[in-house]
Design a protein with these regions (language model features):
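Short helix-coil transition sites and intra-membrane helix breaks within transmembrane domains
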Residues: 75-77, 88-95, 125-135, 163-171, ...
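Hydrophobic alpha-helical transmembrane segments of multi-pass integral membrane proteins
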Residues: 110-141, 145, 379-392, 408-444
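Alpha-helical transmembrane segments of multi-pass membrane proteins
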Residues: 112-124, 150-163, 189-207, 381-384, ...
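Re-entrant/interfacial helical elements at transmembrane boundaries that shape
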Residues: 134-144, 158, 171-182, 403, ...
Length: 526
């Protein structure tokens, strides 16, 4: 009964968005209200509350869970979404987006390659460096600027922002996953490398299938060409990511793998792709190119310098100007670094780039204010969804859903292990949060199934437990595609207010395929 009650918020959200075609902000807010009521009146009687909170007031527990969710929504998720769209609006205002469009089309006039370059290559790079929605918001906005339809731009950006999310924000999700199951609470480099490699192996077919889907969504009439490009780009992507994961760990697969994909796409475009005979090449000087790309170049510099790839700066930023909010009852403290978050890096990069492009600081602040006002419904959506996820977590609903799946599947559990991770990401919108929620569950089930030794998985030897634990992040990357939070980001980026349900409906078949294939790979490896 607990599992059935716990799944009500997820089902309700689907029904409201898909069945009743209710706008995302209304669906999310109504689902939050229902979730709070379930937590207040059903969680305790059904024994869903975790032992550490069994003696706490359910009213206080639920209330503080909502507060935590709202804090997480604003700091940093909404700030990052706002700044990502602000950066694009600067390009539109300065008209430098026209130069970027011409430069992209000068690489090739093949729309499929352009889309793949943006959502798979550039999007993967953004995910690897920053995460938190930038890899959906920025590529989708650029695609709109290149003349692609909003629905198409939203869908391909969501499909593209998947495999890289496991190693997003310089590897935080997989590092967190390993730390959660490590006996000491801090995973060894060897464990992180092994788990990273396992996740990439489990995702390997999707490195080819997803580029093929993206290319086919762009051009349905050249399937053979699409397959050749997908094989070329996908095999290079997965090979580079595997080498990075196996030897270096979780920090570099998405970043270096995406750079390799960008190079592979450009090489194919220059060597093999046919160019239109009537295409007129337009050249730009270095200063013109620098001016056009200054927004994203400065963003890239700030993210790299402030991130984990630059430890001294990263350590300084993380230990200065940090606000802490104690959350009674929950027994936790919410911390936010004012100078270490990706939102600030986006703001600084975009603003300095805007000044380089000739806009005054006053004009830039007007653009920021206008962008903020236009995102008011997205604010409601994101705040409601993250608060909902927090309530489901502390009331025990998410654990009840996972436990129900374990009980039903038995020895076939590895087949559905990625689904657990996908549910976590669907509810929370975060691969990292999904790993925090379910890493220990996956390790516990591995122990129950007798997966306590070592084995060889598709030619790679390692821990059986780590193989099943890696399945969580494998599924979590697929759940990212249909997470209402990701849908809300795509909706805002493509100016598709009220179209959340349509985007979700379009993405579901690809997400289901993704999660099923991930499950098959995990099961075959056991």
């Amino acid at each position: 009964m607990a599992s059935i009650i716990s799944i009500v918020p997820i089902v309700l959200l689907f029904v409201l968005m898909l069945g009743f075609k209710m706008a995302g902000h209304k669906s999310a807010l109504l689902t939050l209200v229902v979730t709070v009521l379930l937590a207040l009146f059903a969680a305790s009687p059904l024994g869903m509350i975790a032992p550490e909170h069994a003696g706490d007031s359910i009213l206080a527990l639920t209330g503080w869970a909502v507060v935590e969710g709202l804090l997480k929504a604003v700091f940093p998720i909404l700030i990052i979404i706002l700044m990502a769209i602000y950066s694009y609006n600067i390009l539109v205002e300065s008209k430098q987006i026209e130069v970027i469009k011409k430069q992209f089309t000068s690489i090739t006039d093949d729309k499929g390659l352009l889309v793949l370059l943006l959502v798979w290559g550039f999007g993967g790079l953004l995910e690897g460096m920053a995460g938190f929605g930038t890899a959906v918001a920025i590529p989708a906005a650029i695609l709109i600027g290149l003349g692609f339809k909003p629905m198409f731009s939203a869908l391909v950006s969501l499909v593209g922002n998947t495999v890289a999310t496991g190693f997003g924000a310089v590897g935080v999700p997989v590092t967190t996953l390993c730390n959660e199951v490590a006996d000491s609470g801090s995973a060894s480099v060897a464990q992180i490398c092994e788990t990273s490699a396992f996740a990439i192996i489990q995702l390997s077919p999707l490195f080819i299938i997803l580029p093929f889907i993206i290319l086919t969504l762009t051009d349905r009439h050249n399937l053979v060409k699409n397959l050749i490009i997908a094989l070329w780009v996908g095999m290079i992507s997965v090979a580079v990511q595997f080498v990075c994961g196996y030897y270096l760990g979780s920090e570099t697969p998405a970043i270096i793998g995406s750079i390799a994909a960008i190079v592979a796409i450009i090489v194919y475009a220059k060597v093999f792709a046919r160019k239109s005979k009537v295409q007129k090449q337009e050249t730009f000087t270095f200063s013109e190119s620098f001016k056009a790309w200054s927004v994203y170049l400065f963003i890239l510099v700030f993210i790299l310098v402030s991130g984990a790839l630059c430890p001294p700066v990263n350590a300084f930023l993380k230990t200065h100007l940090v606000s802490a909010v104690h959350l009674p009852v929950l027994g936790s403290t919410f911390k936010f670094g004012w100078i270490s978050n990706a939102g600030l890096m986006l703001f600084l990069g975009a603003t300095i780039g805007g000044l380089v492009q000739g806009l005054s600081f006053k004009r830039l602040m007007v653009i920021l204010a206008r962008t903020t006002v236009n995102l008011r419904k997205t604010v409601v959506t994101i705040c409601s969804l993250i608060a909902l996820a927090s309530v489901m977590n502390y009331s025990g609903m998410i654990t009840s859903i996972a436990s129900g799946l374990v009980a039903v599947t038995g020895d076939f559990y590895p087949l559905v292990a990625p689904m657990i991770g996908a549910i976590g990401t669907f509810v929370t919108g975060s691969d990292t949060s999904s790993n925090i929620l379910f890493a220990k569950l996956q390790a516990h089930v591995a122990n129950q199934l007798g997966m306590t030794g070592t084995d060889t998985f598709f030619g790679v030897e390692g821990s059986q437990s780590n193989w099943l634990v890696a399945a969580n992040t494998t599924g979590a990357t697929g759940g990212k595609m249909i997470s209402p939070q990701s849908i809300a980001i795509a909706t805002a980026s493509c100016d598709m207010e009220g179209k959340d349900g349509e985007i979700l409906r379009s993405a579901i078949p690809y997400a289901v395929l993704y999660i099923v294939l991930g499950g098959i790979m995990v099961y075959l490896g056991c």
